[in-house]
Amino acid sequence: MAYQLYRNTTLGNSLQESLDELIQTQQITPQLALQVLLQFDKAINTALANRVRNRVNFKGSLNTYRFCDNVWTFVLNDVEFREVTDLVKVDKVKIVACDGKNTGNAAE
């Protein structure tokens, strides 16, 4: 099973809403919707690992951190994100980072 972090993105939420609508109108079964979501999990993890090449630097004050079940969670305050010419400042950011070395086992 691949990480399901990206289901809570705009793309993931739109997919889930569309699948829910198809289930309600009985055009697909809940089992098929689950298979679609599992395929989405695999595809988005693979695409982000292999296709994204942009880099962003960020700096902020660490508020809290946690490591549980090979998942790091960081909460940062007063964060600055810098790309080549852009600067974005935000009050608070939560970063969830999963062990990429274990995704081979998780993606089956």
Swiss-Prot record:
Q: Which superkingdom does the taxonomy of this entry point to?
A: Eukaryota
Q: Which SUPFAM superfamilies match?
A: Transcription factor IIA (TFIIA), alpha-helical domain, Transcription factor IIA (TFIIA), beta-barrel domain
Its cellular-component GO annotations read: transcription factor TFIIA complex
Disulfide pattern: none
Q: Where in the cell is it found?
A: Nucleus
Please give the InterPro entries that the UniProt record associates with this protein. TFIIA_a-hlx, TFIIA_b-brl, TFIIA_gsu, TFIIA_gsu_C, TFIIA_gsu_N
Entry keyword annotation includes Nucleus? yes
Family to which this protein belongs = Belongs to the TFIIA subunit 2 family.
What is the protein's quaternary organization?
TFIIA is a heterodimer of the large unprocessed subunit 1 and a small subunit gamma. It was originally believed to be a heterotrimer of an alpha, a beta and a gamma subunit. Interacts with NCOA6 general coactivator. TFIIA forms a complex with TBP.
Full protein name: Transcription initiation factor IIA subunit 2
User: What broad taxonomic lineage does this protein's source fall under?
Assistant: Eukaryota, Metazoa, Chordata, Craniata, Vertebrata
Gene of origin? gtf2a2
